[in-house]
Amino acid sequence: MLTIKQLRDDREAAIRRLAKKGVDAAPVITEIEKLDDRRKAIQHDLDECLATQNQAAKQIGALMGQGRRDEAEAKKAEVASLKERSNALNAEFKEVSDALQAAIVTLPNFPADIVPEGKTAEDNLVVKLVESYTQLPENPLPHWELARKYDIIDFDLGVKLTGAGFPVYKGQGARLQRALINFFLDCNTRAGYLEVEPPVMVNEASGFGTGQLPDKEGQMYHATADNFYLVPTAEVPVTNIYRDVILDEKDFPVKMTAYTPCFRREAGSYGKDVRGLNRLHQFDKVEIVQLSLPEKSYEALDGMVAHVESIVKALKLPYRILRLCGGDMSFTSALTYDFEVYSEAQKRWLEVSSVSNFESFQANRLKLRYKDADKKTRLAHTLNGSSLALPRIVAALLENNQTPDGIRIPEALIPYTGFDMIK
């Protein structure tokens, strides 16, 4: 969530920066300014009313002590009237404050200066490209055909049990899935991330804190009986560990990693891009989260990008790194790098990770702060990234390692799978 100060200090700059994300912010900022001015005016009136009320209340006892009962009764009536007015002002203050908050949360985060201009994924900037490591057979099979051939993923059984987008992993497929999760977690913990195992259901405050609510409410599974949400990413519960927390400067950086199943409704998704593992309602993902001092958050982002790249490299997959344009960025992000691996069988790139700096946007919602060397309280910066999302990694591993004799397992994974070939 942006702060009022960010929006009011340089209105035109705020409008210009949000336009890069395709948002016409001028009408919203105008409304925010009006509501902010109204709130300040109500606060001023309320403070004056309470001061007068307190002064009048003090006078009642003195008047009674002097035997001036009629004047004391008049003061009591005045205090009662002032109390009624202060209650009305309090109610109005809350109403205006709620309206102000509702207006502010409609605005996305400012994109960083180096974010490319653009509206769609076609405008993203490729910052690195690494070609294929392996020679594939002619006419390679897509992963959904390989899954059927080797009986390692059953999409039809998932439909029977739940519905489309809920595959069942079997045999070597299930072991590969477990191996990847453990490999990713081990890579992360070796890099200094503390492993945590969070709940996969969160409350509304957690969803709001990281920015999924209200922006992505329609994409989240909602258990209405208890008003809990299934997590779309471990980012939500892990970052919310520090909601309403004030850290010391010496506590940074805070580095955490977690594996969770993730749940997304993906409403409106259809067509060839959703076949097989390309787009699921339930999938496994390992996440890394960092909390950083503001002046060090972009250095932290570079480190996270390098870390995710080291994992993709270890799997020996063809990949590229993109810097997302303003129109393709998330609501909460200030700067995002996407990792994509190439599917030769599908002739397309598959996203397997997004690594983002949110600056203070999430921290402002979370009330995640720290005390600096001067003991002043400031907002921290938050970052996160997938390291990695499994479905498309599995798809790419199957497709890029297929041979006439089976599917090779990358060397780095063999200690985790216990086998070197899917047959």
Task: Label every model-predicted segment.
Residues 1-134, 152, 156:
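N-terminal alpha-helical targeting/anchoring segments
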